[in-house]
Amino acid sequence: MSLSFLLFSPFLPPCFSSISICLSVLSTVSFFFAFTIPHYVLRCGSVDEWHIHSSAEDFRTQRCVCAVKLSASLLGCLLACASWSLLLEVSRIKWHVGTAYS
């Protein structure tokens, strides 16, 4: 059974397809942020170098920016996991309904 059947089954109301599309987009965007985690972890590990080459105010700003970016990456990872779980659940429901009509 193809993924397109699971996402766009004619046996289901249009809202299921809309939910699937939204979850797919959310998953893709979330994974983009989630894959930036290693980059920010490496950048956060080098804040001592920033302190050497910049003022104390710049150092505090960089630490704050680093913390925000890392938090956004972790949130992206959580959103990706949650949206993929929901997408799989919607696909499972569609599969059960689709097999009941065939």
UniProtKB/Swiss-Prot annotation:
Give start-end of the signal peptide.
1-17
Question: A GO CC term?
Answer: membrane
Task: State the phenotype upon gene disruption.
Answer: Leads to hygromycin B hypersentsitivity, increased vacuolar fragmentation, defective CPY processing, and extreme sensitivities to pH extremes, divalent cations, and multiple drugs.
- What transmembrane ranges does the database entry give? 18-38, 70-90
The record's principal subcellular location, in a coarse class, is: membrane
Positions in the Extracellular compartment: 91-102
Q: Tell where it localizes.
A: Membrane
Q: Which domain of life is it from?
A: Eukaryota
Show which residues sit on the Cytoplasmic side of the membrane.
Answer: 39-69
- Identify its membrane topology class: Multi-pass membrane protein
Keywords from UniProt, A to Z, are: Membrane, Signal, Transmembrane, Transmembrane helix
Q: What does this protein do?
A: Involved in vacuolar trafficking.
Name this polypeptide is given:
Hypersensitivity to hygromycin-B protein 1
Q: What is the organism field in this record?
A: Saccharomyces cerevisiae (strain ATCC 204508 / S288c) (Baker's yeast)
Gene that this sequence comes from: HHY1
